[in-house]
Each structure stands twice: as structure tokens, then as C-alpha cells.
């Protein structure tokens, strides 16, 4: 197996939790380098990793095949573009970019360079979403007529990360959390006909949006996507209703919690939700009414990286294509336009 030498462009929370553990533990990857301007956080944890002080050093190292752009949102376009131009394969943290035209340019460049360009939509590989996906795919609810996804939290205080709390391209809840549930909705239900959105600032000291409600219009279905930073008592993460029944599932975070505790990916019980988090299925099949709790699917962020390896080495499709990441940005751009003009935007 020819390992893929991989470089991270940051070792903050994203690099520490969602990338480094996987490219270190998976045999198909080598956590080869990291860009840290002054600290040595990655090297303290992973002794063999090289620490570069400039982005240019990453680009100049010809042994690096894959660059993970996990820097602030407004930098994604610039760093992804320069990485592709340097002949690297690229993974970009969600959100892909801040404007659709940037994504279109990057896709064209990746095609020209014949390089893999993927967006890290890791929430596709969470237990809760995988369980919802199975219920929908197996048609337990009949034809879906209504779906509601929540990504709420309680965070009254303003965060310490200035790039997340200062108004500018790519900041706010819709880019940060909305990119997850928009992607999930598009994967389950496809491209909508129109979008309507209400995007607001609800915390007294916040300068960026911390509340949104996005309504996706389909011919025979509506999908409501909601997030608020002032939800102390969590609502279900997923509520789906169909012609045959309903499914209600709590939002969980078992992989992130395990990673934050330093648990190595792949250990026993990795990605398995506790029994208390089972989703409630109430439906009808073959004339029989069924009401029961459904065990969750196993979450596996590692699957994303396994598929990336196949995309690079075996010319397979990336687990999340740049085009799929671009579609999320198109919805976000349309949602901001809708909220500003207070009208439905046809897509």
C-alpha cells in the first residue's frame, strides 16, 4: 500500500479532532506535515510530523500529495486554489467556499490539474444521520411529505475565536452549522425548487448570525432546517413524516466526544450510540402498525478518508465531491438573499 503523505494547514480544533487522528491511525495515510506559525502542538502529539512555519513551505514540498484546508472559512478559496496549482490533491473543510463562483473556479482548476478536490462534510458519517438515511432509503415512512432538521446549541457567550465572531465572508451559524444540515437534506431529497430563509442575530453581543430557519421547497414536500444558539433544552435533531409514518431521532455527537477524550478511532464501540439515543419509528407495513425504537447505525468518520484514498489511488469517486460542496454554498447564498429581501428565491 502506497501511503498518501498528507499535510494539515491548521492544528486547531478541526485539525486536532477531525483530521489528525484519522490520517495518523489509517495505514493508507501518513500524517506528514502541518502548518503552525509558532506553536508545535501537532509535533507534541505526533512526533514524526514535520512542522512548517509558512504555507509556501507546504506547497514547495513535492512529497506532499494531499493538503487539508482546515483554516478559517474566508481562506478556503485562496488556500485550495494555491494547493491545486502546486499539484496537490485537496480536501477543504466545510463550508467549501463563501461564494458559488469561487467553488466553480476551483472545480474547473481541479479538473484541469486532474486532482481530487473534496469537501469534508463529516456529518454524513454520523450515527444519527446514517440512521435517518437508512429509514428513508428503505421507505419505512412511505413518501416523505415533511422533514425538519435541527442543529441547535446553547452558547450565550461570544466565542474567543475572532474569525468566527467578526462579520465577514463565511462567518455565522448558517455557514458553520447550516452547511452540515443543508448537505444532509440535499443528499436525502435532492435539489429543491426554491428556498426561503429567516437569518438573524439573537444574542445581545453577537455580530454574526446565530439563528436561522431555512425552508426548502420541493414539489410535494417541505424541508425545514433550523439552528439557534439559544436552545438550552434540545429538540429532536430529525423529525420526518411520510404517507405511512413518522421517525423522530435525537441529534448525537458520539464520535466528536470520543475524539475530544483522546480515544483512538477504531477502538471497540467506536461510533456506537448509547441505547438511550434510539430513534422512534411509528409506521405501518403490510397492514400492521409498528411503533418501536430503532437502534442507530454506527458512525464512522474514518470511512470518509478510506474513500478519499480510493479516489486518489484507484480513481474512484470522492466520498463528497466538490460539486456537492458547491451545491451547499448555492443554497446558503440563496438563503441570505431570501432573508435580506424577505421573499422566496427560485433556484
Give the label of every model feature segment:
Residues 50-54:
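Short acidic-hydrophobic, aromatic-tinged amphipathic segments that line or gate anion-handling sites
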Residues 66, 72-73, 77-124:
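Beta-strand-loop-alpha-helix segment that lines the small-molecule cofactor/substrate pocket
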Residues 1-3, 66-68, 115, 293-295, ...:
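C-terminal helix-rich "cap/oligomerization" subdomain common to oxidoreductases
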Residues 183-267, 302-316:
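Contiguous beta-strand/loop segments that form the cofactor/metal-binding neighborhood of enzyme cores
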Residues 1-46:
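N-terminal Rossmann-like dinucleotide-binding module
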Residues 123-205, 342:
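Predominantly a Rossmann-like dinucleotide-binding segment in NAD(P)-dependent oxidoreductases
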Residues 33, 65-66, 146, 222:
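Short, Asp-centered acidic motifs that coordinate Mg2+ and/or phosphate
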Amino acid at each position: 500500500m502506497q501511503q498518501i503523505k498528507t499535510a494539515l494547514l491548521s492544528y486547531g480544533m478541526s485539525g486536532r479532532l477531525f483530521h489528525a487522528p484519522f490520517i495518523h491511525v489509517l495505514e493508507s495515510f501518513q500524517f506528514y506535515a502541518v502548518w503552525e506559525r509558532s506553536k508545535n502542538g501537532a509535533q507534541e502529539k505526533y512526533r514524526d510530523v514535520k512542522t512548517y512555519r509558512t504555507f509556501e513551505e507546504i506547497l514547495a514540498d513535492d512529497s506532499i500529495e494531499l493538503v487539508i484546508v482546515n483554516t478559517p472559512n474566508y481562506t478556503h478559496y485562496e488556500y485550495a486554489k494555491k494547493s491545486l496549482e502546486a499539484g496537490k490533491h485537496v480536501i477543504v473543510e466545510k463550508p467549501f467556499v463563501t461564494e458559488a463562483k469561487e467553488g466553480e473556479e476551483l472545480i474547473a482548476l481541479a479538473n484541469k490539474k486532474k486532482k481530487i478536490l473534496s469537501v469534508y462534510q463529516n456529518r454524513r458519517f454520523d450515527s444519527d444521520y446514517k440512521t435517518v438515511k437508512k429509514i428513508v432509503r428503505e421507505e419505512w415512512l412511505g413518501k416523505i411529505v415533511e422533514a425538519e432538521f435541527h442543529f441547535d446549541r446553547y452558547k450565550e457567550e461570544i466565542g474567543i475565536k475572532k474569525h468566527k465572531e467578526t462579520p465577514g465572508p463565511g462567518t455565522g451559524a448558517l455557514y458553520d452549522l447550516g452547511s452540515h444540515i443543508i448537505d444532509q437534506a440535499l443528499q436525502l431529497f435532492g435539489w429543491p425548487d426554491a428556498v426561503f430563509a429567516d437569518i438573524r442575530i439573537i444574542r445581545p453581543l453577537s455580530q454574526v448570525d446565530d439563528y436561522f430557519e431555512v425552508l426548502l421547497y420541493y414539489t410535494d414536500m417541505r424541508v425545514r432546517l433550523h439552528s439557534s444558539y439559544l436552545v438550552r433544552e434540545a429538540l429532536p435533531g430529525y423529525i420526518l413524516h411520510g404517507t405511512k409514518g413518522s421517525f423522530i431521532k435525537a441529534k448525537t455527537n458520539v464520535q466528536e466526544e470520543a475524539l475530544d477524550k483522546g480515544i483512538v478511532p477504531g477502538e471497540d464501540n467506536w461510533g456506537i450510540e448509547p441505547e438511550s439515543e434510539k430513534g422512534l419509528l411509528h409506521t405501518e407495513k403490510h397492514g400492521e402498525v409498528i411503533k418501536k425504537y430503532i437502534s442507530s447505525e454506527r458512525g464512522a468518520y474514518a470511512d470518509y478518508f478510506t474513500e478519499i484514498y480510493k479516489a486518489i489511488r484507484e480513481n474512484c469517486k470522492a466520498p463528497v465531491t466538490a460539486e456537492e460542496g458547491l451545491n451547499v454554498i448555492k443554497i446558503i447564498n440563496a438563503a441570505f438573499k431570501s432573508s435580506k429581501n424577505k421573499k422566496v428565491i427560485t433556484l
